[in-house]
Amino acid sequence: MDGYVSHYTNKLDAKGRVSIPAPFRAVLVRDGFDGLYVHPSIDQEALDCGGHALLREIDGLLSGLSPYSEERDLFSTALIGTSEILKVDSEGRTILTETLKSYAGITGEVTFVGHGHKFQIWEPGRFRAHLEEARNRVRDLRRQLSARHAAPDAPPLRSHGARE
């Protein structure tokens, strides 16, 4: 996989800088993005981050919506209007703004979590709780998939909290 994989926890230094994990920096470099694109996650109290691949995904989503539609305006506001482009120094560090830290509840440490085309930045305790919930939900979904394979005419899967 050429994307962001695994998770890492790093501390903010006395100047508020945090080191982006080397494997994540390598993906940003391959992507050709100079800096770090960051916006508050729509679904979690975390930050969505990446480079050109993330921006292309957002552009693709927006281009599928009618210009001047309420839906497009809402997505644009949430994904572009609240975003920031952060600088990354020569040692691979960046400084999260107070707005971003406040949204994600970040104080002294952050956990970087790979999602393939993007990564997220979490407050470590919030990430542990999210990971536990995700594992529980995946176990439930796996059981549903197993049951579905046993009964191929079953209705489509619907995960807890799924949107229409």
Swiss-Prot record:
GO terms for molecular function: DNA-binding transcription factor activity; transcription cis-regulatory region binding. Its main location: cytoplasm. Transmembrane segments: none annotated. InterPro entries: MraZ, MraZ_C, MraZ_dom, MraZ_N, MraZ_sf, SpoVT-AbrB_dom, SpoVT-AbrB_sf. Residues 144-164 are annotated as: Disordered. One of its GO terms (biological process) is negative regulation of DNA-templated transcription initiation. Residues 7-60, 83-126 form the SpoVT-AbrB domain. The keyword Transcription regulation applies. CDD domains: MraZ_C, MraZ_N. It holds the Pfam family MraZ. It is found in: Cytoplasm, Nucleoid. One of its GO terms (cellular component) is cytoplasm. It comes from the Bacteria. Keywords: Cytoplasm, DNA-binding, Repeat, Transcription, Transcription regulation. Belongs to the MraZ family. PANTHER family: TRANSCRIPTIONAL REGULATOR MRAZ (PTHR34701:SF1). Forms oligomers. HAMAP family: MraZ. This is Transcriptional regulator MraZ. It comes from Methylocella silvestris (strain DSM 15510 / CIP 108128 / LMG 27833 / NCIMB 13906 / BL2).
